[in-house]
Each structure stands twice: as C-alpha cells, then as structure tokens.
Amino acid sequence: TYMSVHQKLGEKLALEPTIMLAKGGRGNDRIVTTTMHWFYKNPERFKDTFVSIGWSSSHRWDYINGPTLEEKVAGIKGAVKDFSYQWASWRTWEQDWISRDPDVDIDYTATFKMYTNILALQHFFKYHNIPYLMYWALSNDLQQDGDLIHLKDAVDRKHFYNFEESEHVKENIKRYNA
C-alpha cells in the first residue's frame, strides 16, 4: 500500500490514523480547497488534527473537471473519494498560448497565487487552532520583488520548514532547461 511522506511522518510521531488527501500531479489551489473542505465536512476534526502540507509547483494550476464517479480508484493518482468532485491541473510550461500572450506575466501570477494560497491556509489553521507544518514539496523558485515581498514577509516561517529559496532546486531547474 502506498504511503505518502505525510503518512510516514504521522506514523513516526504516533499521530495515527493518518488521512491523505493528496493527488499526484495536482496544484496548490486544490490543496487549499480540499483541505478546507475536508475540515468543514468533518468539523469534529478541528480539535484533534495535525496537518502536514507539501506545496506543489506554483506553475500547476487547477480546475474542477467533474463529479467523482463510483468506479474511480482511490490513491495518489486516482480519485479522492472524500469529495463529490475531482480536480485536474494544467501546467503553465505546457501551454504555448499563455506563454505567447504579452498581457500575461506567468511568473508573477504564479507567485501571487502561491503566496495567497499559503497565507489562506495559514490563516485558516490559525483561526481554527489547527497545528500544522508546511514545506516545499516541489520548486520554490518564486519572484522576489515589488508587492510580492509583502506577501512573502507575511508567511509564518515558524510553521514552514526551510521556507527560503533552495539553491538545489534552482540548479536542478537550470540543468533541466539546458
């Protein structure tokens, strides 16, 4: 049986049972929405749940693609049966039309979305007194100027493991793009 890093962490810390809402290849809009939705569907869990969030790439943009069908299989690549709807994602680097549009700044949009998602969940967890830990599961190479600095500075780093940019991630991106 597949066990996510979050489930393994829960097992090590004796925080079982663990619940995995992740779905491979999805983005951060889905993380925020499904996390909040799960708590609103299970309000008794506000008082006894520790949450571990591994943030996806800022360039994976999610959308709802339809209802959950009975025949879908649960798991990292399958449907998550806890919800009546399912998500899909598109990746900005795979969409030529958006990268050619001079009115769209993909990197700034991705960074604003990323920080907004992080802050939304941090505020949600704090409001409901839910203990949590966040980390970068994928690239964290984000824009670092203008009004973005205000959003970046608002992130609570006490609950975010290794928040600052990762040179290792940057080197891998350079190598991949070479």
Model-flagged regions — what are they?
Residues 33:
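Residue- and microsegment-level detector for short, conserved "hotspots"
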Residues 1-30:
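Serine-esterase "nucleophile elbow" of acetyl-processing enzymes
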Residues 36-178:
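Alpha-helical cap/lid subdomain in secreted, periplasmic
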